Amino acid sequence: MPNEDIEGKTKIIQEIEDPNLVRIVTKNVLTANDAEIKASISGIADEKTAQTCNIFKLLKQHNIPTAYQSRNDNNSFIAKKCKMVPIECVIRRRPYGSYFKRHPDAVVDQTFDPLLLEFYHKHAVVVPRIQRRVPRYKNNLQIQHLPENEIKWSDTNTTDSPDPSFSGVDIFTDPLIEFDQNPEAIATGVWHLYPAKQPRTANQEPLHKIVPVVGDEEIYFIKNSLMIPTFEVIENAWKKFNVTLVDMKIEVGYTRDGELVVSDVIDNDSWRIWPNGDPKQQLDKQAFRDAPSKLSVVEENYKTVTQYTNKF
């Protein structure tokens, strides 16, 4: 029989009778900036579910491995049950967002060819504030089991009220993983984690060093069989409507059969898209980040994106 549901910020994962499958239910919620910005929008779940189903159907048509099985109803779909890999896989055609924060001299009309591939860890790094020159304290994060004067991991769960015991630490969410560009990381099998939203100084020490969560062969597969093909298929679909796919993120996981697949969701929260290549015409969630009070604009944008993806 089905067990307990797993509820996150924007979706609920429900077990069903088939132990190999789950039902993914989208909530009428948008969040941004590590859930500092949150809004309820009636009907947004239906739009996001339609977008995800349209995208995964497109990927399956191009033989890209995905967890997606079928749409269930207006705000849910059925997918293979996966053990998620705790990394966020980002593909960039153009610089934006955290890339500009790490590379303030970059220009917006720069193009990455080949695509720029980045990995971020899904856990936060918690560092005693005295160790960092540039603090980044996120007071909405719940940090568990923090030893005194030690670097520690924690899931980036949100809480309505910050714990005062966290006031002496800096919390770096979704740290950037460095392994390809770092000879030591390759030689020793260590991943180095750096702040995702700060420039790197010369000889800067990483926030933390960890044992890799997947091996070199898996990273190669994720890059070349999941990340690049996924981006290129979706990029070509958007090009038909003269919409630029600037960047996007995906998550991956292992099915119960051990297959590594694109999983979770891909919807208007997952990318930046600019009609006519113009950032002022953005249709994605960046509009919500920039002006969270203009929910009617955000709602219309999501409806427009659904209409586009219906034609993919």
Where in this protein do the model-derived segments appear?
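Acidic/polar, glycine-anchored loop/turn motif associated with catalytic or activation segments
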Residues: 1-247, 254-312
